[in-house]
Amino acid sequence: MELSSKKKLHALSLAEKIQVLELLDESKMSQSEVARRFQVSQPQISRICKNKEKLLADWCSGTANRERKRKRESKYSGIDEALLCWYHIARAKAWDVTGPMLLHKAKELADIMGQDFVPSIGWLVRWKRRNNVGFGARHVLAPSFPPEPPPPGLTSQAQLPLSLKDFSPEDVFGCAELPLLYRAVPGSFGACDQVQVLLCANSRGTEKRRVLLGGLQAAPRCFFGIRSEALPASYHPDLGIPWLEWLAQFDRDMGQQGRQVALLLAARVVEELAGLPGLYHVKLLPLAASSTTPPLPSSVVRAFKAHYRHRLLGKLAAIQSERDGTSLAEAGAGITVLDALHVASAAWAKVPPQLIFSSFIQEGLAPGKTPPSSHKTSEMPPVPGGLSLEEFSRFVDLEGEEPRSGVCKEEIGTEDEKGDREGAFEPLPTKADALRALGTLRRWFECNSTSPELFEKFYDCEEEVERLCCL
């Protein structure tokens, strides 16, 4: 005896359901006859009749996907509806709405609604399908009346003159992007060793944003097994700065603190971001295109580079002392992007707040006219041993020089080269490795007449490592 095959469910699209309703209204056909015509069950036709008003509303809205057969309600229907409302407003204003922009807005709406929701690409695809949303050419309706002229003296965001009087020094931020030859040593560097760094701080110097590094490698092997949220700085797999994502995070952070802040940017960057919606807590203030004043004082940028190079030379000297016969260039070739990320974070922390504040005042980028203390804070760390002040100063400003040909290839090497830390996977340390390392480090301190203050810092580190090992 053969088992009868299970009858396959035939779902109707929205367009077909409207045809069903039209047939029932305009003809004398019964629900059973209509069901046979569309090859569905009679109860399915009955459900269509019960949902008649909702189906007609979806059809008339013009936003529903008319070929969609099943409309499963989203778990976050409130976010769905709010995002769709924002989308229609954005399109009416002729904004170029992109996928990342919708993801950012969905997350922002979820935070406002108090929902623990992280939108994904898959969720966005389903949301677009549910609401018949596409990113084709814009069709903006012309207003039925001429726009009302702005009040006297009021200009658009792109035309705003640089005015800081409405902000306190704590709420005025400046940021700068700069190239950095992250593993260069005096007299030896290559262009392929470059990363792009984004620095941002407020004019008082009391708040520094997380350093962002952009590099050419999409997934450096030195990041294998690393949790990005545990790092003191961020890495972006491109030399270009991801302004949209960075500004969105900055805006969220300021919103959580209930602050309205000003961000000084180069006119070129502000022009590229023209029409960017969704910044509610960060006001972009462009510097004049003809201005030679950078949005983050050059003395602050130079101080960061000086501390970076000073710390890098210290690290390389330690490597040389461990490996006899290793040249400075050979030691530098082993520096990875991950090393550079940590050194950059430490160097940025070393830039003193007094220097930042005085530099903003001198450049006219901070509100108020009262100068800081007459005591001038040095922007340079102590000159490393083996270099004169002039040599170290030239090393700090290395990015302005032309790289020597051939050096880049030697420093990068190949994946098979021995000692190439960038091209090889290192085994992940275990909890036992971490505890043994603590014991080794303490023993080394004990044998080298370490100061009590350093032991206090070590105890804090030891306590935290032991806590993490117990998780």
Curated annotation (Swiss-Prot):
PROSITE patterns: HTH_CENPB, HTH_PSQ. It is found in: Nucleus. GO terms for molecular function: DNA binding. SUPFAM superfamilies: Homeodomain-like (SSF46689). Signal peptide: none annotated. Residues 31-51, 100-130 bind DNA. One of its GO terms (cellular component) is nucleus. Keywords: DNA-binding, Nucleus. The keyword DNA-binding applies. Belongs to the tigger transposable element derived protein family. This is Tigger transposable element-derived protein 3. It comes from Homo sapiens (Human).
